[in-house]
């Protein structure tokens, strides 16, 4: 802006905030620095943060317009340069005090990024250098020179995308070498004295003598543009190349600049060369690149494009050119503003990304680790999105991406870039995200095989404290994830500690190594660190082992309790883990937890040693008598494994063998197999003498013959006796007095053995009845012996089940979310809807239970009040035979004969389980109850009858609606069989003043309606279209909706018409058609106005008639599918279409109204199940051409007919499979090709089943009406078209599995014109002269076609 400004001192210095008082779109946020040339601030704008550069105007006459025009032209030129960020706005006089420049705010520049953690690695530096050269190349190709490239003007986003900004074409090109004032004023904004300016820009100070003289003259203005032209000479490309080289050098030397001002001037004169700084660049290719770029001779510097080509495969990996640059550029576009969208796009492309960056799908690093290191660039994109993700799905997708990429990333990236974000996710508000973050963190840390020097204490100081809160998380799934992964976390932490210790020892033992750096030495010695680690993990393990949810404890045991034993050591494994695990067997309600104990105990016992066998023996015995047979199986397997490992003492082995032998006749197959497994392992472990002397006596009662090879499972299984019958076993086990049963069975056995002379029948009638039941189920003497063999097990199991039942009652009463109605004194009532057979009066008894007085009245109303006022307290005595059987509550019957079972009180229920000879329950006679109680029952009965009647009516309506849909016809009046319209014009109607958008015919074919852009809806009488009258006019016109009427549909016959306009209005009109054709009337009934921003205007509509509801379904341009219930004026349903598939253009409804299909502007066809309002399938046209019109196929339920943009294509798609079944192709282009030499499209379609021979009528932009015979395609023809159109033929062929009916123009015959006789005098063309927008048919005495066109014409044909 002229060198003279450098020497002028401003008369007044104002703060940058003061300049914002005159601009209203920007709100001052904070200052970003201030120099004499520019004051820089950050401001808030409705579109985000912006950088505002303020130039204080000292002279109001200063001409700044030319500079503004230059900056605006620069902005236009750089519009497509994705690595350039020019000023978006320039205000030469934003106020009287200043001119301002505006651009988007980016947080970090390259100077700051170099010194910010995590530090850039080598591949990231190369990527940034590559982008710097790319940005310079983009600018130069656009005809723009930067003029001030430096690290402060290279912006770096959070995902390492480079933006070259603050283009300085307004700054002087040349500077005096003997006066640093200009350099300080224009270029040294950071006050670092760093110089990036090309040496040729410093010239002899003599050329500025004239300007200096001007400055001495007080009358000279601040800037004299004419005298400043020498300083504003043309910027050369080589100047930018030099500056870019200095920036790249500073990038690779960790912020050490190549030149300051004095060094650059010396370099210009050949007295200095920055060799010392260049040698700090370790990469030789980068060093050579920088050396070439800072060549003192500008002619020897190449173009940026040449450097990119030269260093391809050298300084810059090939993957930058082939994949990363084009792929990453898509995220710089404005369309990718959402972090969620970026993550979902990367997840979708993950396979392609890994293939390109790694060359294979496996994490091996065989060829070119540099290719896999390109993933670091992608990781920066992922991590930059993590903190701004909104949806749960996106967060889970991001964690999934990290997990896929982690095996291919370096240790530094995993610890410095990935781990902090995973810990961030561990504090997310969504439990699923917290749980998945913990799992991902565990797996990522397990991949680390070496610990960098900076991360020696990462576990005790960062990771474990960062996730400590998850052990007490409110969500069970989070604690579950912690329990699932804590063993691996502890294992990895111990490995980290050992790696650090080993690394420290190796460094200390190296003879040529200096004193070990304190940073690499862990705090204190190894034992202290290990103890601290043990305490941290132990605290969380104990918390999880004491968790209120059993599933957390179970998961901890199943997911690595053995690894925790190894981590803690033998002493703590016994004191901490085993002591807590033992308590799990006290939970009698959750057999899964008890089973998990026996699954895990083997690993713990193996680590603790055989000393634990005395502790475990009673626990294992308890498992063998568990109430749940699955737990018994797991206990047997645990015993077998412990015996194999030698963890059981020999006396204990024999004791267990005696307990387990009876299981050989247990009815459960798994238990028998488990017992056989234990017996065979014991036989294998002990000597042959012990087998026959100590083991065989236990087995003899259960085998059919003596056996030698007991240690072989198959042998032992083959000689086992048949097990006890399951029915007998279960019935005996459920007996309440099982001890008495076994005493009697034992006496019967003694009698059989001869040791007892007589066995009297049992005195207790209960035992007698039980024995009788067992004998009736087939219990033999052999079965009795087997039951006696299982006596000890069955007795213990019976007691265990009884205890479990008692504890379950206690447990349920305090369980969250469970309401104990009995405890509240509330009696449930069940009413039989079928009148039962009357019982004798003496059996019709009603039991009264006194209820708590504080029961809520609302509950009494729902469940019934059984306590009448002033009920007599004295109860009559009942006979002994009135016994209430368990499970069959006493019944109460009202005067109407409705039976009402009444539940017993808790005391009665409890008494029912106590063995008693006469469990008599007192009942209340019905005669005792006062009349108020009967009135309450009568009221309940009335309400019940009303409910039944309501349900019957509802069921009736649903049945009628179902029958209506099942019997639904395609149309009430289909065309007559063999109908083939001749194309004779019957009526030419020109009442509309603008394009007609839609035609609809009423169900009875009495009327048809048209809507137009002229804002009118016209109703026409079909009967008048037969050509018998001289003039044909519409019978009704409605024009009060406003806007352009885009679509309409008839509702419920001919009486209602729904219309929609582009102004968001939807109206339901009533048509009084009963007096046709005399004086019809039309009037609005209902209306609604859609939100144009939220929904947009309606593009298509249809009517659902489901019997119970009359629903008007309409689709809007913004993707809403709404069902408007016309009977209640509310929405029956609302669906939301994903606009990523394109805007909705049309939709069609299945004839049975079970599903609908929408078509979009991007060629997608999406199906929705209307029963559940869920999307079910989506398919897309191969060319993604716009869907013009959709219709259902009249014969095939899953087919839709779609008219698409171009080639007059109409295709029939099977939405169930996604296949294109049939295509009608009225174009000269090759069938099914995606080329479109024919721009014509079908805008209107009509399809009819036509008595099993479906036909299709199409019309569109070529102004022709075509008749397609879908059964015999060769019989298709053009019904009406423009005069002189060539004749056509139709041929059927199969292309790529799709049937195609193609229209082919016949060759014109060459010869005299009179070869073909004329039918009459030359007639005027009767076809349409503009695009046909819709087509329909109606039937009167014959079939008619009605078409409408864009010029407002409606024509009727026959």
Curated annotation (Swiss-Prot):
**SUPFAM superfamilies assigned to the protein according to its UniProt record, in alphabetical order:** ARM repeat, Protein kinase-like (PK-like), WD40 repeat-like
- Top enzyme category: transferase
Instruction: Give the EC number(s) listed in the UniProt record.
Output: 2.7.11.1
Q: Which SMART domains match?
A: S_TKc, WD40
Entry GO MF terms: ATP binding; protein serine kinase activity; protein serine/threonine kinase activity
> Positions modified as Phosphoserine?
808, 813, 853, 865
Locate the region Disordered.
1307-1326
Cite the entry's keywords alphabetically.
Answer: ATP-binding, Cytoplasmic vesicle, Endosome, Kinase, Lipoprotein, Membrane, Myristate, Nucleotide-binding, Phosphoprotein, Repeat, Serine/threonine-protein kinase, Transferase, WD repeat
Which residues are annotated as modified residue Phosphothreonine in the UniProt record? 1316
List, for all copies, the residue spans of the domain called Protein kinase.
26-324
The similarity comment for this entry is:
Belongs to the protein kinase superfamily. Ser/Thr protein kinase family.
Q: Which reaction does it catalyse?
A: L-seryl-[protein] + ATP = O-phospho-L-seryl-[protein] + ADP + H(+); L-threonyl-[protein] + ATP = O-phospho-L-threonyl-[protein] + ADP + H(+)
Which cellular compartments is it found in? Late endosome; Cytoplasmic vesicle, Autophagosome; Membrane
What Pfam families does the entry give? Pkinase, VPS15-like_hel, WD40
CC annotations in GO: autophagosome; axoneme; ciliary basal body; intercellular bridge; late endosome; phosphatidylinositol 3-kinase complex, class III
Repeats (HEAT): which ranges? 413-450, 458-495, 572-610, 612-648
Q: Which residues bind ATP?
A: 32-40, 53
Describe its membrane topology.
Answer: Lipid-anchor
Q: Which PANTHER family match?
A: PHOSPHOINOSITIDE 3-KINASE REGULATORY SUBUNIT 4 (PTHR17583:SF0)
Which protein, by its recorded name, is this? Phosphoinositide 3-kinase regulatory subunit 4
| Primary site of residence | other
Bias-annotated ranges (Basic and acidic residues)? 1315-1326
The record's PROSITE patterns line, in alphabetical order, gives: HEAT_REPEAT, PROTEIN_KINASE_DOM, PROTEIN_KINASE_ST, WD_REPEATS_1, WD_REPEATS_2, WD_REPEATS_REGION
Stated role = Regulatory subunit of the PI3K complex that mediates formation of phosphatidylinositol 3-phosphate; different complex forms are believed to play a role in multiple membrane trafficking pathways: PI3KC3-C1 is involved in initiation of autophagosomes and PI3KC3-C2 in maturation of autophagosomes and endocytosis. Involved in regulation of degradative endocytic trafficking and cytokinesis, probably in the context of PI3KC3-C2.
Assembly information from the UniProt record = Component of the PI3K (PI3KC3/PI3K-III/class III phosphatidylinositol 3-kinase) complex the core of which is composed of the catalytic subunit PIK3C3, the regulatory subunit PIK3R4 and BECN1 associating with additional regulatory/auxiliary subunits to form alternative complex forms. Alternative complex forms containing a fourth regulatory subunit in a mutually exclusive manner are PI3K complex I (PI3KC3-C1) containing ATG14, and PI3K complex II (PI3KC3-C2) containing UVRAG.
Q: Which domain of life is it from?
A: Eukaryota
């Amino acid at each position: 802006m002229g060198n003279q400004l450098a020497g002028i001192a401003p008369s007044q210095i104002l703060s940058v905030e003061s300049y914002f008082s005159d601009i209203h779109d920007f709100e001052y946020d904070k200052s970003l620095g201030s120099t004499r040339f520019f004051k820089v601030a950050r401001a808030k704008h409705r579109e985000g943060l912006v950088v505002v550069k303020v130039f204080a105007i000292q002279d109001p006459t200063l001409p700044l317009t030319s500079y503004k025009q230059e900056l605006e032209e620069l902005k236009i030129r750089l519009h497509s340069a994705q690595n350039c960020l020019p000023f978006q706005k320039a205000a030469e006089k934003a106020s009287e005090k200043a001119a301002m420049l505006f651009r988007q705010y980016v947080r970090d520049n390259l100077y700051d990024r170099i010194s910010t953690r995590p530090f850039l690695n080598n591949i990231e530096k190369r990527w940034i250098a590559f982008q710097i050269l790319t940005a310079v190349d983009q600018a130069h190709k656009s005809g723009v020179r930067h003029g001030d490239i430096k690290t402060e003007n290279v912006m770096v986003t959070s995902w390492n995308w480079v933006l070259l900004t603050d283009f300085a074409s307004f700054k002087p090109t040349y500077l005096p070498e003997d006066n640093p004032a200009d350099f300080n004023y224009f270029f040294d904004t950071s006050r670092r004295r760093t110089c990036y300016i090309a040496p040729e820009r410093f010239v002899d100070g003599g050329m500025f003598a004239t300007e200096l003289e001007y400055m001495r003259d007080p009358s000279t203005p601040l800037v004299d543009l004419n005298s400043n032209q020498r300083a504003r000479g043309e910027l050369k490309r080589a100047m930018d190349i030099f500056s870019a080289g200095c920036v790249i050098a500073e990038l690779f030397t960790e912020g050490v600049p190549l030149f300051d001002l004095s060094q650059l001037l010396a370099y210009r004169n050949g007295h200095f060369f920055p060799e010392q700084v260049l040698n700090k660049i370790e990469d030789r290719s980068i060093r050579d690149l920088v050396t070439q770029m800072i060549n003192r001779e500008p002619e020897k510097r190449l173009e940026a494009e040449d450097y990119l080509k030269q260093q391809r495969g050298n300084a810059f990996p090939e993957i930058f050119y082939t994949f990363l640059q084009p792929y990453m550029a898509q995220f710089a576009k404005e369309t990718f503003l959402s972090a969620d969208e970026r993550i979902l796009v990367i997840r979708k492309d993950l396979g392609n990304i890994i293939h390109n960056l790694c060359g294979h799908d496996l994490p091996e690093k065989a060829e070119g680790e540099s290719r896999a290191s390109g993933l670091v660039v992608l990781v920066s994109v992922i991590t930059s999105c993590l903190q701004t993700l909104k949806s749960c799905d996106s967060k889970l997708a991001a964690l999934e991406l990290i997990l896929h990429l982690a095996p291919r990333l370096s240790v530094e990236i995993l610890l410095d870039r990935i781990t902090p974000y995973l810990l961030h996710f561990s504090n997310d508000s969504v439990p699923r995200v917290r749980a998945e973050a913990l799992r991902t963190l565990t797996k990522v840390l397990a991949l680390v095989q070496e610990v960098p020097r900076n991360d020696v204490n990462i576990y005790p100081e960062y990771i474990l404290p960062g996730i400590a809160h998850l052990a007490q998380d409110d969500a069970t799934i989070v604690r579950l994830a912690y329990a699932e992964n804590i063993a691996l976390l502890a294992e990895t932490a111990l490995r980290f500690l050992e790696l650090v210790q080993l690394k420290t020892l190796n460094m200390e033992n190296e003879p040529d190594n200096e004193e070990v750096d304190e940073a690499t030495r862990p705090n204190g010695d190894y034992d202290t660190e290990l103890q601290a680690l043990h305490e941290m993990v132990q605290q969380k393990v104990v918390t999880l082992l004491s968790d209120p949810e059993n599933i957390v404890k179970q998961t901890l045991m199943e997911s690595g309790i053995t690894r925790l034993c190894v981590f803690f050591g033998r002493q703590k494994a016994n004191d901490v883990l085993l002591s807590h695990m033992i308590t799990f067997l006290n939970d009698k309600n959750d057999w899964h937890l008890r089973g998990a104990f026996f699954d895990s105990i083997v690993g713990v016992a193996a680590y603790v040693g055989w000393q634990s066998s005395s502790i475990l023996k009673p626990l294992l015995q308890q498992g063998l008598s568990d109430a749940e047979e699955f737990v018994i199986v797991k206990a047997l397997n645990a015993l077998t494994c412990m015996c194999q490992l030698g963890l059981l003492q020999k006396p204990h082995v024999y004791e267990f063998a005696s307990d387990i032998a009876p299981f050989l006749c247990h009815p459960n197959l798994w238990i028998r197999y488990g017992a056989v497994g234990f017996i065979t392992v014991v036989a294998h472990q002990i000597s042959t003498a012990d087998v026959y002397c100590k083991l065989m006596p236990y087995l003899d009662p259960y085998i059919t013959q003596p056996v030698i090879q007991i240690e072989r499972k198959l042998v032992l299984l083959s000689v086992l006796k048949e097990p006890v019958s399951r029915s007998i076993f279960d019935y005996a086990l459920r007996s309440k007095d099982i001890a008495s049963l076994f005493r009697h069975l034992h006496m019967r056995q003694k009698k059989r053995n001869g040791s007892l002379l007589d066995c009297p029948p049992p005195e207790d009638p209960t035992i007698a009845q039980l024995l009788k039941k067992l004998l009736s189920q087939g219990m033999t003497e052999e079965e009795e012996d087997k039951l006696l063999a299982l006596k000890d097990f069955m007795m213990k199991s019976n007691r265990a089940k009884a205890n479990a039942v008692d504890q379950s009652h206690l447990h349920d009463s305090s369980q969250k979310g469970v309401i104990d109605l009995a405890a509240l004194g509330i009696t449930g009532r069940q009413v039989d809807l079928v009148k039962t057979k009357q019982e004798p009066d003496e059996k019709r008894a009603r039991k009264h239970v006194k209820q708590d007085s504080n029961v809520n009245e609302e509950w009494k109303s729902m469940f019934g009040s059984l306590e009448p006022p002033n009920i007599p307290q004295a109860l009559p005595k009942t006979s002994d035979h009135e016994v209430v059987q368990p499970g069959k509550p006493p019944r109460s019957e009202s005067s109407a004969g409705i039976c009402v079972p009444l539940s017993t009180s808790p005391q009665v229920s409890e008494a029912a389980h106590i063995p008693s000879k006469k469990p008599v329950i007192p009942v209340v006679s019905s005669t005792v109850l006062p009349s108020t109680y009967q009135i309450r029952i009568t009221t309940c009965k009335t309400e019940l009858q009303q409910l039944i009647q309501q349900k019957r009516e509802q069921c009736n309506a649903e049945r009628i609606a179902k029958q209506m849909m099942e019997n639904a016809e395609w149309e009430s009046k289909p065309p007559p069989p063999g109908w083939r319209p001749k194309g004779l014009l019957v009526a030419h109607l020109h009442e509309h003043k603008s394009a007609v958008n839609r035609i609809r015919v009423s169900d009875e074919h009495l009327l048809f309606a048209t809507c137009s852009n002229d804002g009118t809806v016209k109703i026409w009488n079909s009967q008048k279209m037969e050509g018998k009258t001289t003039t044909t006019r519409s019978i009704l016109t409605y024009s009060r909706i406003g806007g352009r009427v885009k679509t309409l549909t008839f509702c419920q016959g001919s009486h209602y018409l729904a219309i929609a306009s582009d102004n968001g209005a939807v109206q339901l009109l009533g048509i009084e058609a009963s007096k046709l054709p005399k004086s019809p009337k039309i009037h609005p009934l209902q209306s609604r106005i859609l939100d144009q921003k939220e929904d947009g205007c309606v593009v298509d509509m249809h009517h659902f008639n489901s019997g119970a509801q009359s629903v008007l379904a309409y689709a809007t341009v913004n993707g809403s599918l709404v069902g408007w219930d016309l009977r209640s004026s509310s929405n029956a349903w609302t669906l939301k279409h994903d606009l990523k598939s394109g805007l909705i253009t049309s939709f069609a409804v299945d004839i049975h109204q079970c599903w609908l299909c929408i078509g979009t502007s991007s060629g997608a066809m999406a199906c929705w199940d209307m029963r559940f309002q869920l999307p079910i399938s989506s398919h897309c046209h191969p060319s993604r051409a716009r869907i013009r019109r959709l219709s259902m196929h009249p014969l095939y339920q899953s087919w839709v007919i779609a008219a698409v943009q171009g080639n007059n294509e109409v295709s029939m798609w099977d939405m169930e499979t996604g296949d294109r079944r049939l295509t009608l192709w009225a174009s000269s282009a090759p069938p099914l090709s995606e080329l479109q030499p024919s721009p014509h499209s079908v805008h209107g379609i009509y399809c009819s089943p036509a008595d099993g021979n479906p036909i299709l009528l199409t019309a569109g932009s070529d102004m022709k009406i075509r008749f397609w015979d879908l059964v015999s395609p060769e019989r298709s023809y053009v019904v009406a078209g423009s005069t002189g159109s060539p004749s056509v033929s139709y041929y059927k062929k199969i292309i790529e599995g799709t049937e195609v009916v193609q229209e082919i123009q016949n060759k014109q015959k060459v010869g005299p014109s009179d070869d073909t006789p004329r039918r009459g005098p030359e007639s005027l063309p009767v076809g349409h002269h503009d695009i046909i927008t819709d087509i329909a048919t109606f039937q009167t005495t014959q079939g008619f076609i009605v078409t409408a066109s864009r010029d407002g014409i409606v024509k009727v044909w026959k």
